[in-house]
Amino acid sequence: MVFRIASSPYTHNQRQTSRIMLLVLLAAVPGIAAQLWFFGWGTLVQILLASVSALLAEALVLKLRKQSVAATLKDNSALLTGLLLAVSIPPLAPWWMVVLGTVFAVIIAKQLYGGLGQNPFNPAMIGYVVLLISFPVQMTSWLPPHEIAVNIPGFIDAIQVIFSGHTASGGDMNTLRLGIDGISQATPLDTFKTSVRAGHSVEQIMQYPIYSGILAGVGWQWVNLAWLAGGVWLLWQKAIRWHIPLSFLVTLALCATLGWLFSPETLAAPQIHLLSGATMLGAFFILTDPVTASTTNRGRLIFGALAGLLVWMIRSFGGYPDGVAFAVLLANITVPLIDYYTRPRVYGHRKG
């Protein structure tokens, strides 16, 4: 059987592409603001580094390929790739990591396939996974939200840690990651997985400061709600379609609910899955990438549901605390197959 992506390349109108990318960038403002509020200025520094790296990397490749640099950069796709990677990594990760991940995403995962519209995998998630596999410690060193943090780095401190590894007063990531309980903090998903494996009960885990939020992990619930708000705005602007976010979130919630009902002592409750990690960012800003997602309505529902199932399985049974990036890439692999079996039948066509 030969699989074909019938509508590739997906982006034919550069002005339309530029407008959609700009809408996505604007929709990201609430999520970025929430991450800045809870995790400090490091997020902004990472966004600036990633944006500059993405534009320079794209310009370099276009120059080598003798293509128009200015016209292509105006589509804002490189900028969006850098932004999505920057908000996915810890805010005080070393500067060279975000540069390396962004350059890899733009050059290897996008331009080597032929540029926008030709890449089969989401470039930002390729860059993220490369960094996660290569530097797992740095990529899981998140700061505690400011509500439970002992040391809150300012703008200058954030720059110093990102570029030198420590603040002017000698503080490093180990001291900055301390929570009010004197324990180095991780994300709610990472904390849950580590604690369950250590033999702690769910009742004990829920007493940790990181779970003192109203619905889920402190800070993270509001970050996810902010990304949700941006995603709803994208739907209202008709920049994305509802099929993928809805099927992804419904499937994730359903799997999490069933798992929690059958094994409440080892699996996280559905609200933790929905409002922790990169759930809403993935649902509305990453999975909906028109280049790497399914192109039919039925296909989008299947694609989103598959990603939701994979996220829950990786979070619950895998070796990584948050499975959004891996789920996105694994779902990307299935897109030609999904599109092949869900493409509309041509009028008058009969199976011979």
Curated annotation (Swiss-Prot):
Subunit structure of this chain's protein: The complex is composed of six subunits: RsxA, RsxB, RsxC, RsxD, RsxE and RsxG.
Cross-referenced HAMAP family: RsxD_RnfD
Bilayer topology term: Multi-pass membrane protein
Cofactor entry: FMN
One GO CC annotation: plasma membrane
EC number(s) stated in the UniProt entry for this protein: 7.-.-.-
Function: Part of a membrane-bound complex that couples electron transfer with translocation of ions across the membrane. Required to maintain the reduced state of SoxR.
Keyword Coiled coil among UniProt keywords: no
Species of the source: Escherichia coli O6:H1 (strain CFT073 / ATCC 700928 / UPEC)
EC main group: translocase
Family: Belongs to the NqrB/RnfD family.
Annotated localization: Cell inner membrane
Gene Ontology process terms (BP): electron transport chain; transmembrane transport
Record-listed FMN phosphoryl threonine modification sites: T187
Record keywords, A-Z: Cell inner membrane, Cell membrane, Electron transport, Flavoprotein, FMN, Membrane, Phosphoprotein, Translocase, Transmembrane, Transmembrane helix, Transport
Name assigned to this protein: Ion-translocating oxidoreductase complex subunit D
Record field: transmembrane: 20-40, 42-62, 78-109, 123-143, 148-168, 214-234, 242-262, 267-287, 301-321, 322-342
